[in-house]
Amino acid sequence: MSQAGRDGGDSCYRLRCSLLGHELDVRGVARCPLWPGEGFVSVSRDRSSRLWVPDSPNRGFIELQRMSGHSNFVSCVCILPPSDLYPRGLIATGGNDQNICVFSLDSEKPLYTLKGHKNTVCSLSSGKFGTLLSGSWDTTGKVWLNDKCMMTLQGHTAAVWAVKILPEQGLMLTGSADKSIKLWKAGRCEMTFLGHEDCVRGLATINDTEFLSCSNDASVRRWLITGECLQIYYGHTNYIYSVCLFPNSQDFVTTSEDRSIRIWRKGECTQTIRLPAQSVWCCCVLDNGDIVVGASDGIIRVFTESPDRIASIEEIQAFENELSKATIDPKTGDLGDIKIDDLPGRDHLNEPGTRDGQTRLIKEDGKVEAYQWSTGEGRWMKIGDVVGSSGATQQTSGRVLFEGKEYDYVFTIDVNESGPSHKLPYNLTEDPWLVAYNFLQKNDLNPMFLDQVAKFIIDNTAGQTPSTNLGYTDPLTGGGRYIPGSSSTDNNGADPFTGGNRYVPGSSLQSDYSAAAADPFTGKNAYRSSTAPTPNAYFPKTKPVTFDQANPSQILGKLKELNESAPEERKLPEEDLMQLDKLLSVAVNPSGGTVTAQQLDTLWRVVNWPEDLIFPALDVLRISIKNPTVNEMFCNEKEGSQFSSYLLQLMSPSGKQANQLLALRTFCNSFFCDPGSCLLMVERDNVLSKVIELKTVNNKNIHIALATLMLNYAICLHKVSDIEGKAQCLSAISSVIEVVQDLEAIFRLLVALGTLISGDTNAMQLAKSLGVDSQIKKYMSVTEPAKVNECCRLLLNML
């Protein structure tokens, strides 16, 4: 085993113990703080999960609990911290059967199973209050609260291999096979991080503002949550599967397909530990700094810095013997091209290495042996026998990784004997001449070498056929390799609860609008509670809030004025204007008559005027939509979709603010009657997505209308058992409350929050996990209007 000391010291990691039990690959390990001492949980392709605890006073661990519940390979594991509902915490595992199983510490069978993903669940992360984030090959992330799915994160175009929750800020991270990382807040994608050149496989949070990612491109990147990549770490020579931080430190450990774990101190790889297994899938760090590693040979190995916990001499020797007998394919390591005749003999090992983990090849009895330098022990240690060679003698169907991409060959080209050598990657499907030309261009080499390089490629690949990997077996599933985006399941986004499409989180569209804050249509803005403030004065609110004030004569006068400017084919005759006058009269005074079909037909024609002329017509619609006949006409099952689409089009962030405002108020007033309420619940995804887009419009009246619309949604959702709908509305409220500043809008958002969570423990816990309490606390110091402070106090007491 290779060892290396930290900078300025002799400390290095050595084997503590090897744990046998799993029968196939160990795919995930997680520190288990639920158990006193240094316990951890492992999961495997053998379909089992196991809880391991220290075997005091020995150096090893014993298997305390074996858990089963998956019908296929188990891919990932995480620990849910203690909560009011489960004071001892829980263990969650994700599997190839598309399910998440949740266990207690003393249960062999799941307490409950989370269903909803449509492909392998490959990553899990826990947050506060029982929140769980999962990632899947179905390209989505899902947020769970106890046994319910609260929201689905859609936006990636390939498998979500890694997830992580930043609980203090209510943020979530997802890493994907589409090479991107996304930052989510309250169910919406706030930022996409680009830079990795291949699948993102692992994530680790450093603090509230920084995190690490690892990738199939053989690199680790350090990011700020604001988007900047601070540093890139290179050292591994193949896919990096996992990254894990040391306790209270920015140092970390990584595992890779190159058969190694690597320990990084102060940004440098200070120790490389080779394992006698091809794929080192996973790792976790215990509170005492010991490293737990799971690999493709089914063995869990624990490494320690502590002299008190190091394995016996016999155990270490057995480990090194096993390592020395391993066979190494040069295409999977950092061995370079091998020319057996040019290799030195054993005498070459008398020269010390220059860095920890340095690899040296020697020729011994006709075989090629690989040795690795251990700085900590000051010796070369055999890490295996090299089988085959890279370059012209490649005979296997394997692929070579170079700069994060796979190739059939990676040649070493010495164009000039006195100059440096260069790597030339090549796939058998490529044109040798084009590859040679690009190689010379990239390395700024003389074009006169074109024929020579192209001929070299042709000569050294003669008789070979393109690698199709038809025989490849995925080490996770046992089937063919997962190709990002090629899932065999249907990823059309069907909602697991409704059968309809999921809410797709939208990103904010930045716009800078300026508008007078005065409301030209309704006068005073403030919604006032019908009773004096008492502990129950504000929520749950049970009746929709509407915009009722109107001046029919002014509205009709403006209509007549704009009618003169309308295109000839759109102008209304005097008789039609009279119909609108009658409609307004009935809408304002329901006892004054009945609404006629002619009046409704005229209204629909006038609201289809050009957008710069329609705002008084929209005001007629806003007032009259509260009438049951008008509401039924526009919001019925047959016509409702067209009506909703029309208003949503007017709410475009690039549209006119008067139209945006009146469209929002029309939606608010539509809740007054059952047809409108039903329509808006059906159209909730589209409407709330548009609400989020409009939050940056700089107009307080629009913000008040947005808040009122969400309040009316909260009133509807309070009456039904729809946790996903409540999660969606909570997400929208959390997004809008970050932006708006008008205190009347804030008040209505607070009432909406209180209405949503009243009497619903799940909604209350979700609000906590989204960090809503910190948003509420910002307004506790408001003294006027007093209702804002009072709502904040009541909400915080509930949470």
Swiss-Prot record:
Keywords: Cytoplasm, Developmental protein, Neurogenesis, Nucleus, Repeat, Synapse, WD repeat. SUPFAM superfamilies: ARM repeat (SSF48371), WD40 repeat-like (SSF50978). The keyword Ion transport does not apply. SMART domains: WD40. Residues 372-471 form the PFU domain. GO terms for biological process: cellular response to lipopolysaccharide; macroautophagy; negative regulation of protein K63-linked ubiquitination; nervous system development; positive regulation of dendrite extension; positive regulation of neuron migration; positive regulation of prostaglandin biosynthetic process; positive regulation of synaptic vesicle recycling. ARM repeats lie at residues 550-592, 593-624, 625-673, 674-719, 720-759, 760-799. Gene3D superfamilies: Leucine-rich Repeat Variant (1.25.10.10), PFU (PLAA family ubiquitin binding), C-terminal domain (3.10.20.870), YVTN repeat-like/Quinoprotein amine dehydrogenase (2.130.10.10). GO terms for cellular component: cytoplasm; nucleus; synapse. The keyword Membrane does not apply. It comes from the Eukaryota. WD repeats lie at residues 21-62, 69-113, 116-154, 155-194, 196-233, 235-274, 276-314. Residues 537-798 form the PUL domain. It is found in: Nucleus; Cytoplasm; Synapse. Pfam families: PFU, PUL, WD40. InterPro entries: ARM-like, ARM-type_fold, PFU, PFU_sf, PUL_dom, WD40/YVTN_repeat-like_dom_sf, WD40_repeat_dom_sf, WD40_rpt. GO terms for molecular function: phospholipase A2 activator activity; ubiquitin binding. Belongs to the WD repeat PLAP family. Plays a role in protein ubiquitination, sorting and degradation through its association with VCP. Involved in ubiquitin-mediated membrane proteins trafficking to late endosomes in an ESCRT-dependent manner, and hence plays a role in synaptic vesicle recycling. May play a role in macroautophagy, regulating for instance the clearance of damaged lysosomes. Plays a role in cerebellar Purkinje cell development. The PUL domain is composed of 6 armadillo-like repeats and mediates the interaction with VCP C-terminus. The PFU domain mediates interaction with ubiquitin. This is Phospholipase A-2-activating protein.
